[in-house]
Amino acid sequence: MSDILKKRSSMTTDGDNRAPNRAMLRAVGFTDEDFHKPMIGIASTWSEVTPCNIHINKLAEKVKEGVRTAGGVPQIYGTITVSDGITMGHEGMHFSLPSREVIADSIEIVSNAMRHDGVIAIGGCDKNMPGCLMALCRIDAPSIFVYGGTILPGHCDGQDVDIVSIFEAVGKFNAGKISREEFIRIEQNACPGAGSCGGMYTANTMSSAIEALGMSLPGSASMPAVSSRKSEDCYEAGKALINLIQKGVTPKRILTKKAFENAITVVLVLGGSTNAVLHLIAIAKEIGVDLTLEDFDRISKKTPHLADLKPGGRYAMTDLDKVGGVHGVMKYLLKEGMLHGDCLTVTGKTIAENLMDMPDLVPNQTIVRKKSEALHPSGPLVILKGNLAPEGAVAKISGLKKISITGPAKVFESEDDCFNAIMTDQIKPGDVIIIRYEGPKGGPGMREMLAVTSALVGKGLGEDVGLMTDGRFSGGTHGLVVGHISPEAFDGGPIAIVQNGDAVTIDSGKNLLQVEISQEEIQKRLKNWKPIEPRYKSGVLAKYAKLVQSATNGAITNLL
């Protein structure tokens, strides 16, 4: 191998002065020949804490094989993961979004310290994807992301079930709509094995976005975790990285503004998670691309929602995979002039070149509609502003018959208080719930509200109640909900001064979020507002709260 392939690792392995470095590398298996090969870091998020990542050690070994075959020398190392599903609904969820930053920091630290010539990151659970991409942006060596893959659906009483099924069953059981036996059966069958949550929830949304960005191999996003194709995907990624090193292609050449526009388009067409807004902005900031809420709003207004996928629709990612996958959707969008086909990807080819030889969506399939038969003529992710969110907020309207509400505010200072109110029947049709002090700083950690929204759906209130928060929502959430309200309550945003009984309006059709009081009254209340004490005085959450930026800036902690 030419020294041109060892631009980074040569400072670790070359010359007499690096004999001590080589001695230690020999102890981990390096041979004389290996010192002349590019060193490849394989960042593995393997963990036993979640089904999303339980299999990733095996995938990392397949990547390692591919790297070896192509002439590189691989080094697997670990980073963390947090299970969003298992931390949902309690104090543990405060740590989920901060884990994105730790993943990014740890991969940056290891691969920059070891001077890896290229990096492959493998992720499964929600925060893995953006965390890995943020790190690859910072390192800016030739890089590929590999998605661990989606879980297969569970089966219960003749129906497919998944993790959201059991979250919603909590509300149904509490309301007496299902028996304890049914409740237990759903719990026992919702998650049949390895892989990320199966609808177009956050993990599958971000895997789709990353394929559209050009940072994973074509077809990677929709393969099931336990399929032989996923193992092959990992092997091919290992080989492809050496090609990228030879061509000198790094994330800065791939992750352009047009690439992010492609990702946003794919997310909107698929009906993806609101978390994509937060994470794509964060990734863009790391690579130096100016991406804002206005970009999402602009693209959403001209992009139809085409895919009938959960949580708002009927189908799972495995169903989409059977009819052509995310790459099939992208091929259709390219033909319709909705994607930038000239964007470079990790194959060393453009989006258009990659899709040329990929199969079309299966004829007569019912999962992805044609533009002329769209589920909705514009995108399901809606950016709202108004006197409650001067800097912006994000709503998702897929699958909703009702996209606006005006009603009396029911104000809660935390998710926990709101959940208890729902379960004790204190929330009535027409109410607009406000959960505040759950933002990036105030939470801290911007908790996801899946327990709350699922309880509302289970109680039959999903479309009869509005909900807004400076926190976030799981990709599994559906209902008339608004998150990411900025400025957050902790920073003195107007959401902090809403009182019980104030008339509040959510109007996704008009992109409006407001409290029906005068500007003078808002200013008067803000003048009398006093900030709350930080909830954590030490440890990682205290540090995070001091560093984190607003949701409109992707809730990043990097000092950009």
UniProtKB/Swiss-Prot annotation:
Cofactor(s), by name: [2Fe-2S] cluster; Mg(2+)
InterPro entries per record: DHAD_IlvD/Edd (IPR050165), Dihydro-acid_dehy_C (IPR042096), DihydroxyA_deHydtase (IPR004404), DiOHA_6PGluconate_deHydtase_CS (IPR020558), ILV_EDD_C (IPR056740), ILV_EDD_N (IPR000581), IlvD/EDD_N (IPR037237)
Binding positions (Mg(2+)): 84, 126-127, 448
Residue ranges that the Swiss-Prot or TrEMBL entry lists as coiled coil: none
SUPFAM superfamilies membership: IlvD/EDD N-terminal domain-like, LeuD/IlvD-like
Key words, A-Z: 2Fe-2S, Amino-acid biosynthesis, Branched-chain amino acid biosynthesis, Iron, Iron-sulfur, Lyase, Magnesium, Metal-binding
Gene Ontology molecular function, alphabetical: 2 iron, 2 sulfur cluster binding; dihydroxy-acid dehydratase activity; magnesium ion binding
Cofactor: how bound: Binds 1 [2Fe-2S] cluster per subunit. This cluster acts as a Lewis acid cofactor.
Annotated positions binding [2Fe-2S] cluster: 52, 125, 197
Pathway(s) per entry: Amino-acid biosynthesis; L-isoleucine biosynthesis; L-isoleucine from 2-oxobutanoate: step 3/4; Amino-acid biosynthesis; L-valine biosynthesis; L-valine from pyruvate: step 3/4
Domain of life: Bacteria
N6-carboxylysine carried by residues: 127
Residues of the active site: 474
Protein EC: 4.2.1.9
Subunit record text: Homodimer.
Protein task: Functions in the biosynthesis of branched-chain amino acids. Catalyzes the dehydration of (2R,3R)-2,3-dihydroxy-3-methylpentanoate (2,3-dihydroxy-3-methylvalerate) into 2-oxo-3-methylpentanoate (2-oxo-3-methylvalerate) and of (2R)-2,3-dihydroxy-3-methylbutanoate (2,3-dihydroxyisovalerate) into 2-oxo-3-methylbutanoate (2-oxoisovalerate), the penultimate precursor to L-isoleucine and L-valine, respectively.
Name of the protein in its database record: Dihydroxy-acid dehydratase
Annotated organism of origin: Leptospira borgpetersenii serovar Hardjo-bovis (strain JB197)
